[in-house]
Design a protein with these regions (language model features):
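N-terminal secretory signal peptides that target proteins for export/translocation
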Residues: 1-4
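Bacterial N-terminal signal peptides
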Residues: 7-18
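Sec/Tat signal peptide C-region and signal peptidase I cleavage site
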Residues: 19-25
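Short, internal strand/loop/helix patches
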Residues: 31, 93, 100-158
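A short beta-strand-turn-helix
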Residues: 34-53
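Short active-site neighborhood of thiol/selenol oxidoreductases, capturing the structured segment around
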Residues: 48-71
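Conserved helix-turn-beta segment immediately C-terminal to the redox Cys motif
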Residues: 70-112
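Thiol-/selenol-based redox modules, centered on thioredoxin-like
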Residues: 148-149, 158-214
């Protein structure tokens, strides 16, 4: 599976950049609803995914390449059939199950959402940016942050990926910035799965922010 299916939207803004400094961020257990439009001018918001885990992978242009690769890896990890799916179906693949999950209960999905942060694009040129995004990403929705929402709400480290995890109740679980090594990637994936497990009706507990090296 080529990374381009996730990569193209963010590659529009990407340039090679040095490794970003690692940032540590601790968030409150607050409910959030991040809303913006995608390249098709469709309104998108995290609130509609209540009951699932949302992973927002965002970056400015210097961090776009690393962000796209991280997002692609996360999506394929939780949706393995995406590896061989056609481009038109890549983002619609079923989520991997959880051991011991009741057959009668819906398994929480994991929505890995690419966000292109472009506050520097002036309003008259935003139409051009949307058009280019539609051409390069006709199937995968890319949220376009022209207003600096992500940086204002969660902070952002330039030159690398930034990740926000939102739990099944719509609460900010964790925020991390900077390049992840293999162990950190596994810790992030484990934290997402733990949120999914905790949402099971018979064992539901408050989702606690994971201690992840950032």
């Amino acid at each position: 599976m080529s990374a381009s299916r996730f990569a193209l939207p963010l590659l529009i803004l990407a340039i090679l950049a040095p490794t970003a400094s690692v940032a540590r961020a601790q968030t409150g257990n607050r409910v959030v609803n991040i809303a913006m439009e995608d390249q098709f001018r469709n309104r998108r918001e995290t609130g509609v995914f209540r009951g699932d885990v949302v992973v927002l992978v965002y970056a400015e242009r210097k961090g776009a390449e690393a962000a796209l690769e991280l997002g692609r890896r996360l999506h394929v990890l939780f949706h393995p059939t995406a590896e061989t799916a056609p481009a038109s179906e890549w983002s619609r693949q079923p989520v991997v199950g959880l051991p011991g999950w009741p057959a009668s209960v819906r398994v929480p999905d994991v929505h890995v959402i690419p966000v292109a942060c472009m506050p520097e694009v002036p309003k008259p040129l935003q139409t051009v940016a949307r058009s280019r995004m539609r051409t390069d990403s006709p199937h995968v929705s890319v949220w376009l942050d022209f207003e600096g929402v992500m940086e204002r709400t969660f902070g952002m480290v330039p030159g690398g990926p930034n990740v926000v995890v939102i739990d099944t109740n719509g609460r900010t679980h964790s925020v991390q910035s900077g390049h992840l090594d293999e162990l950190e990637f596994k810790e992030l994936a484990a934290a997402v799965n733990q949120i999914r497990i905790q949402s099971r009706p018979d064992i539901r507990t408050a989702s606690q922010p994971a201690t992840i090296r950032r």
